[in-house]
């Protein structure tokens, strides 16, 4: 007797990222009610299911949607506005001066462009921190991805609130407004140790505990940050945040570049996750996070792109390549950061960084969030080891289809939920707005 399902996907290869890292050649995947019903050999899965829709993808590879562990989606509107600068100069001289004029329309347009870029390159979920976050959520709701997001909390006025008290109240309102949306989850996001006070960080942690939300913070990104933290508070960033109670299993720390061995041990003992951003860290010369050492300690590490203003893309395929290459060079060891480990970071590690169980794998009961690559692309042939190709050969431009909760959001150059040409016209207006604010 066959079992009904909404969609039956057939493909030459399915990379499941399940507990056994099963790869199915000539496989099929059944989807019902937005979740994976079954995955396995084409003949067996097809015979066992009666689909409302059949997607025979032919010579294609199906894999879990990639999970971007740290980004600022709306900052696509600042892509390329300032490059080749240290982090603090980049922030204070170019980014903050524009951001103080932000409007909801600018943020929503930038975030929708970010969602388009992520869908086009196989990302189905992302961890976001920015300003006027309600506008980002509207873009996410339009595009259909999953997002764990939070309003950036500062110890000074932002475009979204006049003071920290109002900022924390805004987090409460955002949580109440969006908590019934199955694809949008809220977190508490103090920006960094150098933009907040000890009291404010403790209030953020208390709010995260009260609302039972994750906490997401930039931490130990540069040696400059470390020096500032020592000068201001008498401690390095990681022990400083630990002393304030921020480092718990609900925390995700972005960057974690400037770490000592003792600080890695401390992170491991707290259960906090790390979002590693190799390309942004390289471009800003922030340093290389000691990822192999963190993984050896059992720390959950995901891969993030950071914002397109500092990367300058949201492409997780190129981020995986950069991650693998960076750590081989940093360690002077070609066995360091092997392909399967990096793929795990971009899928299962991202799920851990988003505190969202079930993401990053295609197994029965997990969300049907997936992406499909065209195996006819010359750079993906011949294929001996799918993980190798996904990390070292794929560029993201082989993506044919991206699906979230069983819904096709992107296929063969077309976005199913929004008018992409209209968005391009809007971005031309946004560019003129940015140039005006910069006086160019």
From Swiss-Prot:
EC numbers, comma separated: 3.5.4.28, 3.5.4.31
PANTHER family the record matches: AMIDOHYDROLASE-RELATED DOMAIN-CONTAINING PROTEIN, AMINOHYDROLASE SSNA-RELATED
Function text: Catalyzes the deamination of 5-methylthioadenosine and S-adenosyl-L-homocysteine into 5-methylthioinosine and S-inosyl-L-homocysteine, respectively. Is also able to deaminate adenosine.
Reactions that this protein is recorded to catalyse: S-adenosyl-L-homocysteine + H2O + H(+) = S-inosyl-L-homocysteine + NH4(+); S-methyl-5'-thioadenosine + H2O + H(+) = S-methyl-5'-thioinosine + NH4(+)
The protein's enzyme class: hydrolase
Cofactor(s) named in the record: Zn(2+)
A Pfam family recorded for this sequence: Amidohydro_1
Domain of life of the organism encoding this protein: Bacteria
Residues that coordinate or bind Zn(2+): 70, 72, 218, 306
Gene Ontology MF: a single term: 5'-methylthioadenosine deaminase activity
Transmembrane segments: none
Free-text cofactor note: Binds 1 zinc ion per subunit.
UniProt xrefs under SUPFAM superfamilies: Composite domain of metallo-dependent hydrolases, Metallo-dependent hydrolases
Gene3D superfamilies, A to Z: Metal-dependent hydrolases, Urease, subunit C, domain 1
Family from the record: Belongs to the metallo-dependent hydrolases superfamily. MTA/SAH deaminase family.
Keywords assigned by UniProt, alphabetized: Hydrolase, Metal-binding, Zinc
Species name: Nitratidesulfovibrio vulgaris (strain DSM 19637 / Miyazaki F)
Protein name: 5-methylthioadenosine/S-adenosylhomocysteine deaminase
Positions that bind substrate: 99, 191, 221, 306
Alphabetized CDD domains for the sequence: ATZ_TRZ_like
């Amino acid at each position: 007797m066959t079992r009904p399902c909404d969609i039956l996907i057939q493909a030459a290869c399915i990379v499941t990222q399940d507990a056994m890292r099963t790869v199915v050649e000539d496989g099929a995947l059944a989807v019902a009610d937005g979740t994976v019903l079954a995955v396995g050999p084409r003949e067996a899965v097809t015979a066992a299911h009666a689909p409302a829709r059949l997607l025979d993808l032919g010579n294609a590879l199906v894999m879990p949607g990639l999970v971007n562990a740290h980004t600022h989606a709306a900052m696509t509107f600042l892509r390329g506005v300032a490059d080749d600068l240290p982090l603090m100069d980049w922030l204070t001289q170019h980014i903050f001066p524009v951001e103080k004029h932000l409007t909801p329309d600018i943020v929503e347009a930038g975030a929708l462009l970010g969602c388009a870029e992520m869908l086009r390159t196989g990302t189905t979920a992302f961890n976001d921190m920015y300003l006027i976050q309600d506008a980002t959520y509207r873009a996410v709701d339009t595009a259909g991805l999953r997002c764990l997001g939070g309003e950036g909390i500062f110890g000074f006025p932002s475009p979204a609130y006049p003071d920290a008290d109002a900022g924390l109240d805004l987090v409460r309102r955002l949580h109440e407004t969006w908590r019934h949306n199955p694809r949008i989850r809220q977190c508490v996001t103090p920006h960094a140790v150098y933009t907040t006070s000890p009291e404010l960080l403790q209030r953020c942690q208390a709010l995260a505990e009260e609302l039972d939300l994750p906490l997401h913070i930039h931490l130990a990104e540069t040696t400059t940050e470390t020096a500032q933290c020592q000068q201001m508070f008498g401690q390095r960033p990681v022990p400083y945040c630990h002393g304030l109670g921020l480092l718990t299993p609900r925390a995700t720390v972005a960057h974690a570049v400037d770490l000592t061995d003792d600080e890695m041990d401390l992170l491991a003992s707290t259960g906090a996750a790390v979002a590693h951003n190799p390309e942004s860290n390289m471009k800003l010369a922030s340093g290389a996070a000691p990822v192999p050492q963190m993984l050896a300690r059992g720390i959950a590490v995901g891969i993030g792109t950071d914002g397109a203003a500092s990367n300058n893309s949201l492409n997780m395929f190129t981020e995986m390549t950069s991650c693998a290459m960076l750590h081989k060079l940093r360690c002077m060891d070609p066995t360091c950061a092997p392909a399967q480990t990096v793929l795990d970071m971009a899928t299962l590690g991202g799920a851990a960084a988003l505190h969202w169980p079930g993401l990053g794998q295609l197994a029965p009961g997990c969300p049907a969030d997936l992406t499909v690559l065209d195996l006819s692309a010359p750079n993906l042939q011949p294929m001996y080891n799918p993980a190798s190709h996904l990390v070292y050969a794929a560029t993201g431009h082989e993506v044919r289809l991206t699906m979230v909760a069983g819904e096709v959001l992107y296929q063969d150059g077309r976005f199913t939920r929004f008018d992409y040409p209209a968005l391009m016209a809007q971005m031309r207006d946004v560019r003129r707005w940015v140039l005006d604010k910069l006086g160019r």
